[in-house]
Amino acid sequence: MTQQIQVDLGERSYPIYIGQSLMSDSETLSRYLLKKRILIVTNETVAPLYLKQIQDTMASFGEVSSVILPDGEQFKDLTHLDSIFTALLQRNYGRDSVLVALGGGVIGDMTGFAAACYQRGVDFIQIPTTLLSQVDSSVGGKTAVNHPLGKNMIGAFYQPQIVIIDTECLQTLPAREFAAGMAEVIKYGIMWDADFFQWLENNVQALKSLDTQALVYAISRCCEIKADVVSQDETEQGVRALLNLGHTFGHAIEAEMGYGNWLHGEAVAAGTVLAAQTAKSMGLIDESIVRRIVQLFHAFDLPVTAPESMDFDSFIKHMRRDKKVLGGQIRLVLPTAIGRADVFSQVSESTLEQVICCA
């Protein structure tokens, strides 16, 4: 059964559909593609699996072209973004274009940013194929590319027309990528929904075995939370910042270790543990909460410690460039309970050094 969730943003509201075989559902896509010139953006891993299926589904609506990019976070940059613009310009695509992001978070972020920029804005559709992109990056309109000095530093808020989440894609997802997606799933439980966190603790094996009912529930709950948060705070002026739990530490790990060497979800898992340990050191939570967080990440085969090669200086140089920094102060999202988090701007660097060095 297909689930539908609405992201309520007034005239820019859009639906999220979650279910099986949705990539073959031309009826759902028809209103967004009729009389449009379609460019599918995908990568070398996803294209052999799903590109022809999507092309066949969309062929009756209009001209369909594709651009296939290399796979990996290290290619989420201005050079490869330009490949999308070149494909559009070479084919003389105009404002009647629609870009379709067929892939994980990298493809979604780059396609959305290209859509935001091309001729000052054309429509785009998200068809996320990884767990991480299904539960997080495809929803909410954050689009960006990386810079050598920082992750997601060049981008825009730009909402899709629709998000199509076909859970059958997860059957071809490598185990490491699935685990990385679970890091974001767990994050929602920590920062927003204690009951969901407990449900995850009780359903580890069902999720790891790709049980359809468990997957649909987990993805739907994450999308419900994300839609609720984005509807309240689209441009991250308030409550949306809570979705960055673990990301300040995590982005530092990704940047320092080289994009693609640590998957985003792996870095978020280790970063969230560091955030929990920081919260404990400040007296916000006790050791039992840290232990539950560590145990759940560990159950999904995720890292719970930072790279051994990273010391305090390695972290802090990246954390000072974080997008949440205001007035020169590092702002951290820290858990205050299972199911609750808050933003803290008075975290001393001495506290951070103690946590990082003792982790």
Swiss-Prot record:
Name the domain of life. Answer: Bacteria
Where does this protein hold Zn(2+)?
Answer: 184, 247, 264
Q: Which cofactor does it need?
A: Co(2+); Zn(2+); NAD(+)
InterPro entries attached here? Answer: Dehydroquinate_synthase, DHQ_synth_AroB, DHQ_synth_fam, DHQS/DOIS_N, DHQS_C
Q: Which reaction does it catalyse?
A: 7-phospho-2-dehydro-3-deoxy-D-arabino-heptonate = 3-dehydroquinate + phosphate
Q: Which family does it belong to?
A: Belongs to the sugar phosphate cyclases superfamily. Dehydroquinate synthase family.
User: Which enzyme class, named as a word?
Assistant: lyase
The taxonomy runs: Bacteria, Pseudomonadati, Pseudomonadota, Gammaproteobacteria, Alteromonadales
How is the cofactor bound here?
Answer: Binds 1 divalent metal cation per subunit. Can use either Co(2+) or Zn(2+).
* Keywords attached to this entry: Amino-acid biosynthesis, Aromatic amino acid biosynthesis, Cobalt, Cytoplasm, Lyase, Metal-binding, NAD, Nucleotide-binding, Zinc
In short, the EC number is 4.2.3.4
Binding site residues for NAD(+): 71-76, 105-109, 129-130, 142, 151, 169-172
Pathway it works in: Metabolic intermediate biosynthesis; chorismate biosynthesis; chorismate from D-erythrose 4-phosphate and phosphoenolpyruvate: step 2/7
Q: Which Gene3D superfamilies would you find in this protein's record?
A: 3.40.50.1970, Dehydroquinate synthase-like - alpha domain (1.20.1090.10)
Pfam families, per the entry: DHQ_synthase (PF01761), DHQS_C (PF24621)
Name-wise, this protein is 3-dehydroquinate synthase
- Gene Ontology molecular functions: 3-dehydroquinate synthase activity; metal ion binding; nucleotide binding
* Localisation: Cytoplasm
GO CC annotations? cytoplasm
What NCBIfam families is this protein classified in?
Answer: aroB (TIGR01357)
> What is the first-listed, main subcellular location in coarse terms?
cytoplasm
